[in-house]
Amino acid sequence: MIPDASSCCSADSISRAKQILALIPGRATGAYSHSQGIKGLRDAIASGIASRDGFPANADDIFLTDGASPGVHLMMQLLIRNEKDGILVPIPQYPLYSASIALHGGSLVPYYLNESTGWGLEISDVKKQLEDARSRGIDVRALVVINPGNPTGQVLAEENQYDIVKFCKNEGLVLLADEVYQENIYADNKKFHSFKKIVRSLGYGEEDLPLVSYQSVSKGYYGECGKRGGYMEITGFSAPVREQIYKIASVNLCSNITGQILASLVMNPPKASDESYASYKAEKDGILASLARRAKALEVAFSKLEGITCNKAEGAMYLFPQICLPQKAIEAAKAANKAPDAFYALRLLESTGIVVVPGSGFGQVTISLVEISRKTNI
């Protein structure tokens, strides 16, 4: 027997479900929607963005997607014409970006996060990499920023974000802001600020800086990875470019309706006045507190291990420790014809059953070329 919904759900939850169903064509999740997503759900997301940032948001700027990844692929398809088009990507990097750039035939232009300053983004280094790429005939078209960081777990300082936005404005770059871990902040002295908020705080208007912001229901405290929901918010693009974005989105007809609903709920959760708010807040706070405890436990554990250093956990779901291998391990790796970090990762797997990815898998380089034979990351 199926229980009466009113016996197990709060009144506001039932009311919300009915409101959402009324927005969907055919009042069911099996029909196609508008290619950008159901208008009422985009309205809810726009309202959530406005509430978060303190600046208006427009439902027409929002494209609902099957997770953040399809939005990334869409923009790479739009931005990359041939191998001479480049995208600036942070290293260590989330492999989605290198794979998507390669898939669409472009060139990855790396900029290296500074491990010694807590994985800081140094504008001077980004500019150096940009100028070097341009000197090689690469037309650099966009800058990717992941905040909070994946796989490094840092949270950008607000001042650093202002510098990044100004840099993109001055250099004519599209800013691709991966903000899927915006709820995961563990450091007391850190706070998430969206790049949309930073852009508007600088007084930039709709046509001043092309910005694409990504959000996903796979991350944060919700973790609905298999539901495949998310969105991208596009601002600062001209009408002809927006038309092309819409055309590409229309090729896939629409994202799945269940994911669209979840994306709207993530950005428009229960309010304090709702009956369901107490249980919602308790579950959310419990999950985030658990993630914070585990991040801290790993940070402390790494700091106690010989030959390992690790920056503090600030956000996202990651730590990126550095391992200083002894000379005998370097020699053993060479004898086995393997890179030291890959050799270490395989030995760790064989000895403990623990699976790790060598630092080189994230594009990571050692602190200096002199120490390249001694230092690695996992």
Regions found by a protein language model. Give the residues of each.
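PLP-dependent class I/II
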Residues: 1-36, 40-378
